[in-house]
Amino acid sequence: MQLDFRNINTLWSSIIVETLSRLGLTTAVICPGSRSTPLTVAFASHSKIDTIPILDERSAAFFALGIAKRTHLPVALICTSGTAGANFYPAVIEGKESQVPLLIFTADRPPELRNCHAGQTIDQVKLYGNYCNWYIELSLPSVEIRLLSYLRQTIIAAWDHALVPYKGIVHLNCPFREPLAPIIEPNIASLCTEVNFDNFFLNIYESNKKRLRTDYLYDHLNHWLSQANGIIIAGVGNSNNTDLYCNQIFRLSTLLNYPVLAEALCPFRNHAQGFPNLINTYDILLRNQKLADELVPDVVIQIGEFPTSKQLREWLTHHQVQHWVIDSRPDSLDPLHNNTYYIRTDIHDLEMEYNKQCIPGKQDLSYLQQWKKINKIINRNIKTTLDKTNELIEAKLPFILSKNLQDKTSIFIANSMPVRYAEFFWMPNKGQFMPYFNRGANGIEGTLSTALGVAYKAKSSLLITGDLALLHDTNGWLIRQHFQGHLTIILINNNGGGIFEMLPIAKEESVFESYFATPQNINFSQLCSTYNVEHILIKNWTQLKRLLNPLPSTGIRVLELQTDRKKDALWLQDNMKKLSMIDNK
């Protein structure tokens, strides 16, 4: 037990931290500031909590988000009063939308210093609006045992709200009066003997609450089993148990004889061994109108978020197929607005009771076999085309990575074009790679900081990013002095926003380059030198492969691929339809 009896603020803050430690908190990210001094001292002094100081609040929040993405446990995030907490907002939005648990502690002035132009004071009450699972303003610190008990129970409640019924953001606003530094107040020290704090912390342990399953999958199986033509969509999702995730989907697919259309931003493509019903080429396939018409399903079972693919969205929107979504969140996860039924549970939590009650899988395999045959041909087309492509084009990068990384590498894929190229060309493999991403709100802010959080104290990791997303978060490199682990950054430098080359606005030459592509003309070698980050310019695919396996165990480095975004866009325009041609092979 690690309590600090030097004054009322140190005791209050150390009870917060000790309670969190007993609940399972292991990591806190702290931004510098005066009003948060009691919290900073308490977190930094606790031997069981890893505390990382980060200057920039926006970067700090995304770094914490990255750690929480990897560990699936809450990370504490601490800042001072005023605008500091406002800089957390982009990461708060992403955390809410992608179900990542964070405990945010914003220090604040006491009530008598609000609304009177006291320095560094803003209205922090419900600062993050509806993006929190829970918000509370703590009372001012007190030594009354009744209020200390209130504090303990409130922290326990905050931990639970960050995890159940679904993961997300909890905001605790924490007012403090002076003294903020750990100046000794003799009357506080006597509490050490007056109160039995061993009993005070009894029965605090990591929550084992499980989500309630309000619906069971087998209630719907009879209908699914009666439909020969169905698909399972393994959508965007980050699993804390990839083997179970893949096995659950595999068992459902085997029972129903449905193909699994697996988004690159879920683990399924990287656990392809033994999963013969995996389909990775659906986006390309659906560009062939004849095939798209032939393969219209009667049933769609979506697991998690809908994939990135615009082709898949338009296909299912046009045909308005019966649609089921398996996900524990109370949100709508159907941007298509189909006739959708929600099974409000997590794919991991399904106990597969239905295997005991249902008939064996259907015998009509023609629909499944058609999907598998076409998928095999298109994969062959992709391999043939990209194997003979020696030029540094963005399309070949995910193809190379999916075949050459060391097993179990963590891969953070930035938004805009990297996630789309991954969906097109990330090949099925048995590497057990773990994809990470910020697809809650799909923004480019915080890309580098989140990736560093994912890589912190983990196995060697990889970030795939464009130049604009990296430039948007260069303050993330300030984390370098406290970073433990390794991150290789593959920088696709096409000097601007490649995704806009795919949109109709690209034809408007008078405004396109300055206002949409926004080239920054940065020398990344010099930029990396400023932050003391290793930089290597990639000149060919052979050089890149040599640097990928094995990855280093420590440090941060940038591998820069210089590409032409206009040529990349033209390549997609010229080749995607060709890749979908099967010619009855």
From Swiss-Prot:
Q: Does the keyword field hold Transferase? A: yes
**Assembly information from the UniProt record:** Homodimer.
Protein name as annotated: 2-succinyl-5-enolpyruvyl-6-hydroxy-3-cyclohexene-1-carboxylate synthase
* UniProt cross-references to NCBIfam families, sorted A to Z: menD (TIGR00173)
**Task performed by this protein:** Catalyzes the thiamine diphosphate-dependent decarboxylation of 2-oxoglutarate and the subsequent addition of the resulting succinic semialdehyde-thiamine pyrophosphate anion to isochorismate to yield 2-succinyl-5-enolpyruvyl-6-hydroxy-3-cyclohexene-1-carboxylate (SEPHCHC).
Cystine crosslinks: none
Q: Which organism is it from?
A: Crocosphaera subtropica (strain ATCC 51142 / BH68)
GO MF terms held by the record: 2-succinyl-5-enolpyruvyl-6-hydroxy-3-cyclohexene-1-carboxylic-acid synthase activity; magnesium ion binding; manganese ion binding; thiamine pyrophosphate binding
Names of required cofactors: Mg(2+); Mn(2+); thiamine diphosphate
Q: Which gene encodes it?
A: menD
